[in-house]
UniProtKB/Swiss-Prot annotation:
SUPFAM superfamilies: Homeodomain-like. One of its GO terms (biological process) is inner ear development. Disulfide bonds: none annotated. It is found in: Nucleus. Residues 162-173 have a biased composition (Low complexity). Changing G197D: Confers susceptibility to neuroblastoma. It comes from Homo sapiens. CDD domains: homeodomain. It is linked to Central hypoventilation syndrome, congenital, 1: An autosomal dominant form of congenital central hypoventilation syndrome, a rare disorder characterized by abnormal control of respiration in the absence of neuromuscular or lung disease, or an identifiable brain stem lesion. A deficiency in autonomic control of respiration results in inadequate or negligible ventilatory and arousal responses to hypercapnia and hypoxemia. The keyword Transcription applies. The gene is PHOX2B. This is Paired mesoderm homeobox protein 2B.
Amino acid sequence: MYKMEYSYLNSSAYESCMAGMDTSSLASAYADFSSCSQASGFQYNPIRTTFGATSGCPSLTPGSCSLGTLRDHQSSPYAAVPYKLFTDHGGLNEKRKQRRIRTTFTSAQLKELERVFAETHYPDIYTREELALKIDLTEARVQVWFQNRRAKFRKQERAAAAAAAAAKNGSSGKKSDSSRDDESKEAKSTDPDSTGGPGPNPNPTPSCGANGGGGGGPSPAGAPGAAGPGGPGGEPGKGGAAAAAAAAAAAAAAAAAAAAGGLAAAGGPGQGWAPGPGPITSIPDSLGGPFASVLSSLQRPNGAKAALVKSSMF
């Protein structure tokens, strides 16, 4: 067992020390302690009893027994604790608020970076280190620049694709609108006019008056140079060119008159067929040329046969 060799803890010396102390100062310093006089009620039996009455602590006097001397013997429990443990959180907040200064690239650096980016979008570590050494930057800054540049490139590609799709949709919409307009115009042109009169007859009425003389038309018998069967028209080459021209004009006039008469008898154009041809009474004798023999053969008493032959010829 350890022996306590603190001589000032002797009962007589302790009582004399406590009697000489100013308890008011002790109470004011430590408010939680009621009074130091309570310690006098405890009896301390020292292990060593070799101290005599004259062997008390001569250095402990009422003047020297004070709060300071007792406090010196107490060891501070926070002596080994570092100072930074009890610092406030203001320093941590300041460190969090401190951000890295934004890197500002020069035009020469950007030019060199863009040149390498045009060659490859994903440079390896050796290329990045060489480029960083060349343009006086760190490899980390070069790597971050390439990451941002790739993101910008992808964004530009998406914007270009969206613009191309919008332009394509706009052109297709315009084409469809123009085709619809053309179709509507064609539909309007093909629709008949509901407010107008009857349209033209798709099957025009054939005019039979020119071939054999229509009903009501003048007969070519009265034409100059015409003659009966016994007249002088039997000689084919006698009229000459003037007579042939006059006969042709007379025949044209007769055909026009016959056509007009046929239309009048039918009640207007497109209302019905013209009446059948009337019998041919006579044919001008002055018509010469290669058809003279045919025309002379038509001058026969049988009018029905002559009309049939002439209608088949024309």
